[in-house]
């Protein structure tokens, strides 16, 4: 029969063949240190509405290490102004069919207040329906801010946005993962 092994089993099997080599003790993997923040802010560099100064986002979900969306129904502020079609509260209401929408020139941003400093494992941004690839989030970054709004962590810029953008702090090298599903 054919033996199927995962890479760690394969390495162990290869190590056992030598006889003289001592097997390494099993060292538990250290879980990543997750960032802690009270505010989650998405912002684009300063620009002109409606081309480079705009955000319209269906939902931003912020998950803790047990997978709870700690941003659900959290208070949202933003600017430079709010578009009447997309009130801030839509960003965290759990409904992918509506959206929050900025208005006017300047720095387009939305900030979620988690209510207290909390450990953050993952952020999932759901784009406004029909806006995958629209560039309305191009070059936006997400900042995690402490209770005093001091920057704790900033993601790299979003480039080539899709329907879903996920940033997972549980992986060795966190980075945006883009998907249209």
State the predicted function of each range.
Residues 19-33:
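Acidic, proline-/serine-/threonine-rich low-complexity intrinsically disordered repeat tracts
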Residues 1-21:
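Single-pass alpha-helical membrane anchors
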């Amino acid at each position: 029969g054919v033996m199927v092994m995962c890479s760690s089993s394969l390495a162990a099997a290869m190590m056992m063949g030598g006889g003289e080599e001592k097997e390494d003790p099993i060292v538990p993997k250290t879980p990543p240190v997750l960032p802690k923040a009270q505010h989650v802010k998405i912002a684009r560099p300063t620009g002109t509405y409606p081309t480079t100064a705009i955000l319209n986002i269906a939902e931003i979900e912020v998950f803790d290490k047990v997978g709870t969306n700690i941003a659900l129904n959290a208070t949202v502020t933003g600017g430079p102004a709010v578009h009447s079609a997309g009130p801030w509260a839509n960003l965290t209401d759990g409904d992918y069919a509506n959206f929050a929408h900025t208005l006017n020139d300047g720095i387009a941003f939305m900030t979620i207040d988690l209510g207290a400093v909390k450990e953050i494992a993952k952020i999932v941004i759901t784009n406004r329906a029909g806006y995958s690839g629209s560039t309305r989030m191009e070059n936006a970054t997400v900042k995690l801010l402490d209770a005093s709004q001091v920057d704790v962590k900033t993601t790299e810029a979003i480039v080539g946005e899709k329907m879903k953008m996920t940033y997972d702090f549980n992986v060795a090298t966190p980075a945006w993962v883009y998907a249209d599903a």
